[in-house]
């Protein structure tokens, strides 16, 4: 009886070890700190996503995407490194299949669906103003006018639903719950927001006392949206040089 039990346990251990050495594509679990891995059998990604997957026991493996207009898949070997990983990068909404082939000829097929991505810009502070070229008294008048003209104050948010890499649907919510719908176009250095008959061009300004880093969960440190409204005041204040207003925001991922 003891001999049979020992043989059974040894068999389980052997099967387990063989399974560990199986050709697999693994997806990291967790956020900034990886807590483990699980086999990757399919991917549902937002248009802004980027996946780095581990290929285990594939030898000199290769990868190909069935539709490179939808998903780019490539083997990445960091400079000076002795390891590689699989990068899956969505380019537009749609579906594709990523095929990973081991050195021995085994294949793993990973269906990939690419949809929208959602990001929220939460307003963290009241408006900050920078005015040059007028007297202190005139500056106070301009600040008062700017305050009355602000649409979004602390506690409000801009919700960005990306249908493409740099554009999509905009939802604006004020602290008292007023909602506006519109569209946006953006890049690393700006946001162009169109809603309620308005078109606002925000420049992006990062804090000098910090750094901007995208993590696996894509939470970022606060930064500023800066709007240049100098032209509004040139007629009334001929000497004016600059009028800028800024809002401190934080960007968070919702998908």
Predicted regions span which residues?
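Extracytoplasmic soluble-region selector
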Residues: 18-255
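C-terminal motif of bacterial Sec signal peptides marking the signal peptidase cleavage site
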Residues: 13-16
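Residues at the start of alpha-helices and the adjacent loop-to-helix junctions
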Residues: 8-9, 82
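Sec-dependent signal peptide recognition
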Residues: 2-8
